[in-house]
Amino acid sequence: MDAKDLYDLILSTYPSVTEGAICDLHKPCSKHRECSIKLSNKYIDFDAVETEFDRGRVSRPSVDAVKNAGQYFCFIEIKGWKKYLEWNTPSEKGIQEQAEYDLKGKLETSEEICVAISGQHNIFRQIPEVFILVTDIDVSEQGVENFHFNMMALATTSSVWESKCNTELNSQLEQQITTIPKYYVTCKQLENKLNVISRV
């Protein structure tokens, strides 16, 4: 079994679960598109897979989406910051709290579900995995080393807060996902990243 076989098996096991663009799986974007970028790739809504898999049991946090890319099986988690920054008065503490995602737990639950669906306990010894954390803000902003200086100089600019959001979330990614390759990208960069991964 390869990554595409696993992807297709998930779809055939749960025919009520559909594929969609990454924008459709991000709740703020699914209701009102914030950008004009048209992304063509389709992803399995893995939250819907978890709901079906755990029906009648306590629901567990899982990744938002999965996708095959060449030999790799990609677990994808979406974390939007734009609406949070628009609707709230940003603070260091607030951003730290928002960034405290159980990424490791989401990955482990999702792996367990894939193992059960495949019927192969060692499926991820056969299929290499990748974890991709996707956000809706620019990930090229400067890190926390410039945060305090920027706060004094540019206290009202959103890019300063985006920098803090990126630093906190990337820190969570680095600390929690330690056994497989991981990437932190914007939604606009996702398809290009998948193309790169598929050529490895």
Located regions from the model:
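Basic, amphipathic N-terminal segments that precede the first structured/catalytic domain
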Residues: 1-60, 193-200
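Catalytic cores of nucleic-acid endonucleases
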Residues: 81-138
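Short, flexible loop/turn elements at secondary-structure junctions
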Residues: 29, 41-43, 50, 69, ...
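Conserved catalytic cores of phosphodiester-cleaving nucleases, focusing on short active-site segments
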Residues: 65-67, 72-80, 110
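Short, low-complexity, polybasic intrinsically disordered segments
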Residues: 125, 129-196
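Catalytic micro-motifs at enzyme active sites that drive phosphoryl/nucleotidyl and oxygen chemistry
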Residues: 53-55, 63-64, 118-122
